[in-house]
Amino acid sequence: MNLPFKIKYQIFKFVSELYGLNLSKQKKGIRILMYHSVGTPVEEDLYNIYNIHPELFSHHAEMMKNHETNVISLTEKNIYLAESGIIVTFDDGFANNFETALPILNSYNIPFSVFITTNYVKEKKKHFLSKEQIKELSNYENIKIGSHAMNHVYLETLDKPALYNELTGSKDFLEDLIGKEIDAISYPNGSVNVRVRDICEE
């Protein structure tokens, strides 16, 4: 185990214990573990904060399993009735979510969700999920496919027509692709306000 990996692992262990993410007696409330890339450096990510080494990611999964963490799937009904738990998500739709993260999480029977920036798929952008991979992911009962808009933009900055196009364009593309309703979104860059939420709920 190299030094950077040791440091990252110890930081995760400290933070997870501090917030009760990996403990059997978990603190109340639902927490989200949001990942992006697993093993592939991300463009313009100078400090490599959006990419996690597969070995470290496997440790995360192992800790959740060993400590009997309540990992909640967004495919479950009435998930918000849970007193405590963790939701595992991936933003953007990197191909390694399918190639690397899926086998690891499946080995521990951990459900997860993938929020996809659909124009990355349309443009066949390097390192991102293909249509075929998205279809295969959607066939798993414990995997939720959601929207991350069409482009990775700040939704709050868009006028109403552009905002509507971003949201409905992504939703329509994914629904046509997998043949299932898309009823979940992760807002790109965390950019959301009342206007954005209202259009999402329409």
State the predicted function of each range:
Residues L33-T40, L46, Y50, S84-I86, ...:
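Metal-dependent polysaccharide deacetylase catalytic core of the NodB/CE4 family, i.e.
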Residues S24-K28, L81-A82, S107:
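Extracellular/periplasmic catalytic domains that process cell-envelope and extracellular macromolecules
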Residues P54, S58, A95, K160-N165:
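Non-membrane alpha-helical structural segments and their capping/turn regions in soluble enzymes
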Residues M1-S37:
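Membrane-proximal basic amphipathic "stem/tether" segments
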Residues I49-A82, E175-L177, E201-E202:
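C-terminal domain-boundary segment and adjacent tail
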Residues D91-D92:
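Noncatalytic alpha-helical scaffolds and linker/capping helices
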